[in-house]
Amino acid sequence: MVIGVTGPTGAGKSTVCDILRNWTGVSVIDCDQVARQVTEKGTLCLLDIAVEFSPSVISADGTLNRKKLGQLVFSDPEKLTRLNAIIFPYILERLREEIADAEKRGAKAIFLDAPTLFESGADALCEKILTVTSAPEKRLTRIMQRDSLSPQGAADRMASQPDADFYLARADYQIQNDDDTAALRLAVMELQNRLGL
């Protein structure tokens, strides 16, 4: 069973997936990590990004300058759409490979930690969807801390994605992450029981 884990940025998807990684027979695929892999130095995806936006998004060492690219796209919806149109096909191809590998290893459940699950089309790879949500003020604080952003930078990142209702309307399961880690672990355990894992 493939389950997409999604929700607005800063909601705690990765924290939920960190808890899931401890389950026996479960595989977690980090789609952000997959995105990093497909944009590594020398990849076709990285070349496509540089051609579309500017060679300046490639650092002197040949790697993607994520901060520079983020500054270009997160405040401009049209540019973000163009970036996604380039990167999503590469990500989907890699996800199919990783899902097949996890199935070969005998995983009972495969969770895709995917911030852009629907936008990328990766939801088509999933049998169920888990949405993680959190209050906007908590998300803002987490994003500022996690990404070392100013309040405006974090707000721009939040504004570049759909709101929680977008994700909830498509969810089979929901976890609300507004409390401490113990409460989150309990919510994940309840999900484990519902899934029969």
Describe the residue ranges of each PLM region.
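Walker A/P-loop
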Residues: 14
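ATP-dependent NMP and nucleoside kinases share a basic, alpha-helical "lid"
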Residues: 96-104, 108-145
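ATP-dependent small-molecule kinase phosphotransfer cores
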Residues: 36-105
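Hydrophobic anchor at the beta1->P-loop junction of P-loop NTPases
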Residues: 5
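Short beta-strand-centered segment that lines the nucleotide-binding/catalytic pocket of NTP-utilizing
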Residues: 26-39
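The conserved Walker
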Residues: 9
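Small-molecule kinase domains that catalyze NTP-dependent phosphoryl transfer to phosphate-bearing small molecules
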Residues: 95, 124-125, 145, 149-197
